[in-house]
Curated annotation (Swiss-Prot):
Protein name, entry field: Peptidyl-prolyl cis-trans isomerase FKBP18, chloroplastic
Chain ranges of the PPIase FKBP-type domain: 108-226
Chief site of localization: plastid
Sorted UniProt keywords: Chloroplast, Isomerase, Plastid, Rotamase, Thylakoid, Transit peptide
Function: PPIases accelerate the folding of proteins. It catalyzes the cis-trans isomerization of proline imidic peptide bonds in oligopeptides.
Gene Ontology CC entries for this record: chloroplast; chloroplast thylakoid lumen; nucleus; thylakoid lumen
Xref: Pfam families: FKBP_C (PF00254)
SUPFAM superfamilies: FKBP-like (SSF54534)
Transmembrane portions of the chain: none
Catalytic activity: [protein]-peptidylproline (omega=180) = [protein]-peptidylproline (omega=0)
UniProt record similarity statement: Belongs to the FKBP-type PPIase family.
Organism in which the protein naturally occurs: Arabidopsis thaliana
Localization of this protein: Plastid, Chloroplast thylakoid lumen
Amino acid sequence: MASISSLHRWASNQHSRLPRITSISEADQSRPINQVVAFSVPISRRDASIILLSSIPLTSFFVLTPSSSEARERRSRKVIPLEEYSTGPEGLKFYDIEEGKGPVATEGSTAQVHFDCRYRSITAISTRESKLLAGNRSIAQPYEFKVGSTPGKERKREFVDNPNGLFSAQAAPKPPPAMYFITEGMKVGGKRTVIVPPEAGYGQKGMNEIPPGATFELNIELLRVTPPPEEK
C-alpha cells in the first residue's frame, strides 16, 4: 500500500498540471457576466499552430473563381470603339474580329455562315440553335445564301437534307437583310461584327427578344464560299 507521503506527492504533482484560473473577487462579481476569463494553460507550439489555423475562415484559402470557359469568354470580348469600325454598303458599321485566310465572298457567290443576333447581352437569334423538323432537340445548322441576293429567297425551299437529320429551311433562324450584303468581302474563316439599325434589321416588327425598332449586333462567321457558276 502506498504511504501517505507518496500520495501527497502524487496529489501535488497532479495539482500543478491543472489549468490555473484567475480568481474573481467579490467586487468583480458586479461586472457583466459575459466578461472574458483568462486561462493560463501551457500548450505546445504545434497545438498553437492548430488553434491559429482553425480560427482562420476557409474563404481565406479557397477563392471562388469563374470557370475557365467563362474567363476565356470575358477576355475575348471587348468593347470596340466606334471609330475603329469600317463603313460598308448602306452605311453599315462593321469590324473584322478575324480576317480569315480562305476564298473571298463576292456578289453572286454562295456563302455558308453561322450568325448570331445579339441584343444587349441576349442572343436572340442564332444558327447555333437551329431546330430539327421534329423540334425535339437543337443543332448547330449553318445558314446558306447567295451574297447580294434578295433576302429570304432561299427560305422558300421546303426541306434541306443534312447529316443531322431532316431540317426545315423555313424553320431556320431568319437572318436580317444586312447579312446578305455585308458578308461581301469576307474571307473564309473570318469573323465580322456588324451594328445593324432597324431599317437593315427586323424593322418595326422586331424578332424574338429584339424589340421593334431596335439596333442590335450581328456576328457572322464565314464557313464556306462557292463561287458563281461562271467563275468556276
